[in-house]
Structures are given as C-alpha cells and as structure tokens.
Amino acid sequence: MRTLCSLLLICCLLFSYDTPVVGELKHLGLKTEFEQCQRIRGYCLNTYCRFPTSHVGSCYPEKRYCCKNIR
C-alpha cells in the first residue's frame, strides 16, 4: 500500500507542473498541428477566418485558426 501511494504521489507531482519533459511533449503536438495546416496549404490566424477563406482546422491549442482560401 505504501508503494502504491508513493507511486501515485510521484505521478501527481510530475504531471501537475509544466516540467521540461511535459513542455517538450506539448511543443511536439503544436508542431504537428502547424505542419498539418501547412500541408493542406492553409495559414494560421489569431482571429476568425475572414470571408475569402474558410476555417479548416486549428494550428495550436491556444485558439489559433487554420484558414484556407475558398478558391
């Protein structure tokens, strides 16, 4: 029981803070979403996509939009 509690405490402490390991994993996810937007020939905006474009996905979890021309 003591071992289980110790492991649970270690896991909670590791994942409760933005440690360098968790930060690196976050950046890997951001890079792949950005690359996916670039692959479909889109571009990233901080605001909503305007009229000649359409919203086709996201670039980052921080509410950035992947927009693509309608043509």
From Swiss-Prot:
Record flagged with keyword Thylakoid: no
Subcellular location per the Swiss-Prot or TrEMBL entry: Secreted
Disulfide bond positions: 37-66, 44-59, 49-67
Q: Which InterPro entries match?
A: Defensin_beta-like
Broad class of the protein's primary localization: secreted
Q: Name one GO molecular function term.
A: CCR6 chemokine receptor binding
The signal peptide stretch is 1-23
Keywords, A to Z? Antibiotic, Antimicrobial, Defensin, Disulfide bond, Secreted, Signal
**Could you provide one GO biological process annotation from this protein's UniProt record?**
defense response to Gram-negative bacterium
Spell out the GO cellular component terms annotated for this protein, sorted alphabetically and separated by semicolons.
extracellular space
Its family remark reads: Belongs to the beta-defensin family.
Q: What PANTHER family does the entry give?
A: BETA-DEFENSIN 10-RELATED, BETA-DEFENSIN-RELATED
Any idea what job this protein has?
Has antibacterial activity.
Descriptive protein name: Beta-defensin 9
The organism of origin for this protein: Rattus norvegicus (Rat)
Q: Point out the gene that encodes the protein.
A: Defb9
